[in-house]
Swiss-Prot record:
A GO BP entry: translation
Residue ranges of coiled coil: none
Key words, A-Z: Ribonucleoprotein, Ribosomal protein, RNA-binding, rRNA-binding
Pfam families tied to this protein: Ribosomal_S8
Gene Ontology cellular component terms for the protein in this record: ribonucleoprotein complex; ribosome
Descriptive protein name: Small ribosomal subunit protein uS8
Species of provenance: Thermococcus onnurineus (strain NA1)
Transport recorded as keyword: no
Database matches in PANTHER family: 40S RIBOSOMAL PROTEIN S15A
């Protein structure tokens, strides 16, 4: 069976593992996009260390959970957002102002919506975490 959205699967796997109190989770298949999203989540303090394990196929990410995630999910479809429009999308996907992050894929890489606002660039919304 094919996996339609590996990013959505990875984020729901992380959320479900956090809810049951697990300390680590294995995410497969691994991809560059999932790795970049995990890096952004780690920089913002939502997960601990993560590492790539090569299994001879697509690979696996081992992620240390620290219990800070209430909800994480992929945004489908991947909406294009201009630099001035982040506040409207923040109201739509996040529960409160300055609580949580939107993860955006831009021409300068994957980053949070706050970093994109500082740099004044738009991009495509790919996920939210709070």
């Amino acid at each position: 069976m094919t996996l339609l959205d590996p990013l959505a699967n990875a984020l729901s796997h992380i959320t479900n593992s956090e809810r049951v109190g697990k300390k680590e989770v294995y995410i497969k298949p691994a991809s560059k996009l999932i790795g970049e999203v995990l890096r952004v989540m780690q920089e913002n303090g939502y997960i601990g260390e993560f590492e790539f394990i090569d299994d001879g196929r697509a690979g696996i990410y081992r992620v240390q959970l620290i219990g800070k995630i209430n909800k994480a999910g992929a945004i489908k479809p991947r909406f294009p957002v201009k630099a001035r429009e982040y506040e409207a999308w923040e109201k739509r996907f996040l529960p409160a102002f300055e609580f949580g992050i939107l993860i955006v894929s831009t021409s300068q890489g994957v980053m949070t919506h706050k970093e994109a606002i500082e740099k004044g660039i738009g991009g495509r919304l790919i996920a939210y975490v709070y």
